């Protein structure tokens, strides 16, 4: 039996109805959060100018079409210029999701969120990109380097063409022990050398804040110690705000401030009264 056009459309709607209901149910949490904490297009907060990161009641909800999950749950956070912060959490704790929000890689679902004085919840994609380009350096867990380019070219990709004579390049190559490798392709470098290239690329534009997602997770202890020593010295010498995310409790001992996260919530936030030096930490 053939179906006319009207009956065929009706059948299509019936077949699509379960998916529609599922999607509608899955978005309830996001709708509820937005009603509770409505977005304000031109929201300002007098505190924002004093902090590199200012979060008040920030939530991030995600859905896979079936279940809802708060991956960041009512986060209150202030990070002042020049701080050295380590965010500690186990796998799945929400630390990388939080890092995406405070680095302006992602927007919250609700709450008040400022990064470098800008309300990220009010920014469109182009505005978020501009905010990151001007203020944020980010070291990705998987480095994100272009394998067919050499060290110099990978680093220079992070800055506009007209600024690629940046004197900061020579300083970074020197401090990160990359000068003798500058013309080598990424495929010819060790894992530790590739990590240092990723760090140089994140810092070449002299960002206001440097974020690192498990910056020593893929290298051995000796390389980790060198990289962490670089972060400590760079924070001290340049005054750049540094925020590192890790599951390694040893790294916490270096930080001036420690934030612990569990199930998308900040469960501890304290100052380290006496950060240890690299050599004082028992790395075994």
Swiss-Prot record:
PROSITE patterns named among the record's database cross-references: ABC_TRANSPORTER_1, ABC_TRANSPORTER_2
CDD domains linked: ABC_MJ0796_LolCDE_FtsE
Keyword terms, alphabetized: ATP-binding, Nucleotide-binding, Transport
One protein family per Pfam: ABC_tran
InterPro entries recorded: AAA+_ATPase, ABC_transporter-like_ATP-bd, ABC_transporter-like_CS, MacB-like_ATP-bd, P-loop_NTPase
Domain of life: Bacteria
GO MF annotation: an example: ATP binding
Stretches assigned to the ABC transporter domain: 53-284
Disulfide-bond pairs as recorded: none
Stored SMART domains: AAA
Gene3D superfamilies in alphabetical order: P-loop containing nucleotide triphosphate hydrolases
Positions that bind ATP: 89-96
Family: Belongs to the ABC transporter superfamily.
PANTHER family assigned to the protein according to its UniProt record, in alphabetical order: ABC TRANSPORTER ATP-BINDING PROTEIN MG467-RELATED, LIPOPROTEIN-RELEASING SYSTEM ATP-BINDING PROTEIN LOLD
Record protein name field: Putative ABC transporter ATP-binding protein MG468.1 homolog
């Amino acid at each position: 039996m053939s179906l006319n056009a009207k009956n065929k459309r009706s059948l299509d709607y019936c077949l699509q109805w379960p998916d529609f209901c599922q999607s509608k149910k899955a978005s309830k949490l996001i709708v509820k959060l937005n009603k509770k904490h409505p977005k304000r297009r031109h929201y300002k907060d007098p505190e924002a100018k004093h902090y590199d990161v200012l979060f008040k009641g920030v939530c991030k909800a995600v859905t896979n079409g079936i279940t809802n999950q708060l991956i960041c749950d009512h986060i209150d956070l202030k990070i002042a210029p020049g701080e050295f912060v380590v965010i500690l959490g186990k796998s799945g704790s929400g630390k990388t999701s939080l890092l995406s929000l405070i680095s302006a890689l992602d927007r919250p679902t609700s709450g008040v969120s400022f990064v470098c004085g800008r309300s990220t919840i009010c920014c469109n994609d182009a505005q978020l990109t501009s905010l990151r380009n001007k203020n944020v350096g980010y070291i990705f867990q998987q480095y994100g380097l272009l394998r067919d380019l050499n060290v110099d070219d990978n680093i220079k990709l992070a800055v506009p063409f007209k600024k690629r004579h940046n004197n900061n390049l020579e300083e970074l190559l020197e401090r990160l022990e990359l000068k003798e490798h500058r013309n080598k392709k990424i495929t010819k470098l060790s894992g530790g050398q590739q990590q240092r290239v990723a760090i140089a690329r994140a810092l070449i534009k002299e960002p206001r804040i440097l974020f690192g997602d498990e910056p020593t997770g893929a290298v051995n202890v000796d390389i980790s110690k060198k990289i962490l020593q670089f972060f400590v010295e760079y924070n001290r010498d340049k005054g750049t705000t540094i925020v590192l995310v890790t599951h390694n409790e040893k790294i916490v001992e270096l930080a001036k401030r420690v934030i612990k996260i569990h199930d998308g919530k900040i469960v501890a936030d304290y100052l380290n009264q006496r950060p240890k030096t690299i050599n004082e930490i028992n790395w075994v």
